[in-house]
Structure formats: structure tokens, C-alpha cells
A protein has these predicted regions:
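Short alpha-helical segments that sit at the start of domains
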Residues: 4-36
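Short, cationic-aromatic polyanion-contact patches
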Residues: 25-29, 48, 81-99
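Short helix-to-turn junction characteristic of helix-turn-helix DNA-binding domains
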Residues: 37-41
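Short acidic, hydrophobic short linear motifs in intrinsically disordered regions
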Residues: 43-54
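Short coil turns linking two alpha-helices in DNA-binding domains
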Residues: 59-60
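Short, hydrophobic-biased segments on the C-terminal half of alpha helices
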Residues: 67-68
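A short, conserved structural fragment
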Residues: 71-81
Length: 99
């Protein structure tokens, strides 16, 4: 199988997975936000919007706008840090979609 054919197969698999999770309608930036939050979660870490902004090197206003849209859609949650009330902890909360 050629490298291009492998790429096409991978792209199709990724597209199917996005549809299954219900995130196929999201922008590239939204998917990157979810990626970094999930990566932090798997490592046992939490992230704030400020920390996410530092990692992603995205304009703050853009990141906050996309982040709030993801909160409104129920894909991420935002909660006050119990140790620092000024900090909001954000995490992935993608609901399971039952077909």
C-alpha cells in the first residue's frame, strides 16, 4: 500500500471516529483544544484557559471564544479551581452518543 493510500485510509478512519464522537462539525481549532485538554487529562493534569493559551500559542480572545462555544455545546466543562478561585479548570466532557 502506498503512503498516499495509507494517508487516505487514516483520514477515513479519523473521519469515522469524529462522526462517532459527534465532533465532525468542529473546526480545526476546536479539535486542537480538545486534543490538548485530553492529553493533559490522560497525564493526570488539569488545565486552565491561560495554560491552554500558552501551549497553543493562539490569540487569547480566539481561544476563549472557541472554548466558550465548546462549553455551550457540552464538549468541555469549566469549573473554579478549589485551590485558586481566580482560575478556571477546563476538561473534556464529550458525551457518549448512542445511535
Amino acid at each position: 500500500m502506498s503512503k498516499f493510500a495509507k494517508f487516505i485510509k487514516f483520514t477515513e478512519m479519523l473521519s469515522d471516529a469524529e462522526k462517532e464522537l459527534g465532533i465532525d462539525h468542529l473546526s480545526g481549532l476546536d479539535k486542537r483544544i480538545l486534543y490538548f485538554l485530553e492529553k493533559a487529562s490522560v497525564a493526570g493534569n488539569s488545565m486552565s484557559f491561560e495554560e491552554l493559551n500558552n501551549v497553543m500559542d493562539t490569540p487569547r480572545a480566539t481561544l476563549y471564544r472557541h472554548g466558550q462555544t465548546l462549553v455551550d455545546r457540552g464538549l468541555i466543562s469549566k469549573q473554579k479551581d478549589p485551590d485558586d478561585g481566580r482560575r478556571n479548570i477546563i476538561s473534556v466532557t464529550i458525551p457518549v452518543r448512542i445511535s
